[in-house]
Amino acid sequence: MSVERQWYLYLLECTGGSIYTGITTDVARRFAQHQAGKGAKYTRSRKPLRVLGQVAFPSKSEALKAELATKRMSSAQKIAFCAKLEQPET
């Protein structure tokens, strides 16, 4: 029986004021990848400035569902959502 890793939904503030949403098992590692230009295509042209927040999920499936719901939010809704999230120590 395999043990699933904990997955995180994370939101990044990017240049131009945009907000990027993604999922990962390691937020600090993924943020570093985005900053190095090796993350998502979106963050290659809109450099990430900081992690706005993160929230843990017990499975990838649950994190993906939350990611989809978050990506459907407006920027104002994402900012309000981030105010409630676990703040990273990066």
Swiss-Prot record:
InterPro entries listed in its UniProt record: GIY-YIG_endonuc, GIY-YIG_endonuc_sf, UPF0213_domain
SUPFAM superfamilies membership: GIY-YIG endonuclease
Top-level taxon of the source organism: Bacteria
PROSITE patterns in UniProt: GIY_YIG
Any Pfam family the entry gives: GIY-YIG
Domain GIY-YIG: 5-80
Family per similarity comment: Belongs to the UPF0213 family.
Protein name in UniProt: UPF0213 protein Reut_B5558
Organism per entry: Cupriavidus pinatubonensis (strain JMP 134 / LMG 1197)
